[in-house]
Amino acid sequence: MKQVRIIQMLMAVVMVLALGSCSSDILSEVENQNGKQTVKMEFVGKVIGFDQQGSSKAKVQTRATSSSWKDGDKIYITFYNGSTVVLGEASYSSASGWSVSYDGNLETGSNLKCEARYFVNATFSSSSLVSLNANSEIYEDLNATYAYSNGSLTVTATLSPKTGRIRFTGNSGEKIYTTGISVYTTFSPAINTFSTSNAMITSTVTSDGSTPYIYGYFTDNDRNLGLVGSDYAFTRTCTSCMLNVGESGYMAIPSESSHNNWRSGLYVKASGVEFKMIPVAGYSGGFFLMAETETTEALYKSVNGTASTSQLPIDDVSYPFVSTFIEKLNNETKLSFSLPSAEQWSYAAKGGNKTQGYTYAGSNTPGDVAWYSANCTSKQTVKTKAPNELGIYDMSGNVGEFVSTIYSTYYPYIFGGGYCSNVSYIEKTSNSNTYSGYDKGGYNFGGSYSYSSYDCRSKGVGFRLILTCK
């Protein structure tokens, strides 16, 4: 027995001496074979830039490339070891080059499969979650390869753009809001998954006359791009060559005098129903957009899960039901819709900064702009009378409209009058912008505004949306 123990001890000493002659990388790997391991990595490859769009709008078939790296650059690598996935995070140092930390064991061999991703303008958290934004660049190679043997690791990858990119030219300091573009918001190496958002994107034109690039892709197949400024809104259906993967382009910010293929107004689609928002500038409380029409049955029902094409205004809905609808709409569009306040509604009804001082919303003749008791006995299709100065329809008559302003607990105001109102009750709200003269006529709309019980609903009462930019 003593001889056996002596032999075992001698063998252990020999193993220690043998390990001591190995490189530190290999020693580290042996010591950490069940935990995170770190080895040197040779990276063979490059980053491919974007196709540049020339001033003639024709795509120039040249690509900028880069093989230079900065301290702190990271490449996230998904190694495949047979059916096992090994996650790696490679970091660059100008002093020592690339090193990669990974959990698990790499397969030995060459031309082995891996995926590589490189990020610019991203935030790397301690939990290895990569936080991204509209200005983050993502380059990847889903068919990269690696070779590994005895602690020597080489990764070969050509990192290409995952998105397209676009910028807007205009006046320095001009602030714009963009809709219709989806961007990546996070990357989780642990599950090898990206998350995305189609929320409104805020950009500002810099001193060089353009905004920073937005990196993303069109949210839907319609390829509708919306731009909102401090006093305008435009929408454009973009060509198939715009914002494709690897494409770089630019567009001039449109104006009222020169907007070419842009449609005036912000067009939004929800549950297959498109509706238009009109910019309302000059309001003391800040710029907002108001729906061109009262909320239609088509929009309300479709967002709530029942397909409809009806262009009648929705009515017979309670205030809580309206709130639930708006929450669903915001979740779907990632925009910030709400009911207008009494002041916002009144300002828009009068024509905003384009007001002509009409008695009714858009005219001194009620029949030109309003459905009311003298010309109908039920609600009518929206947008069949003339609009007001801003291009907004039915702010006098058709159906009364909830606003967010509450008269007292559980009693929201109703503005605009409806089809059952007589002519004196469909005038715009008073120039004083106060509600001291509110009428208690309930759903008969005695006066330009009324109020109702919070959870009550009635035929002839609907609502209209506004959108604020955030």
Regions found by a protein language model. Name each.
Residues 266-320, 396-397, 404:
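A short glycine-rich, aromatic-capped structural motif
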Residues 8, 19-260:
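Sec-type signal peptide cleavage vicinity
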Residues 457-470:
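Short, structured beta-strand segments at or near domain termini in extracellular proteins/domains
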Residues 238, 311-313, 382-383, 387, ...:
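Active-site rim elements
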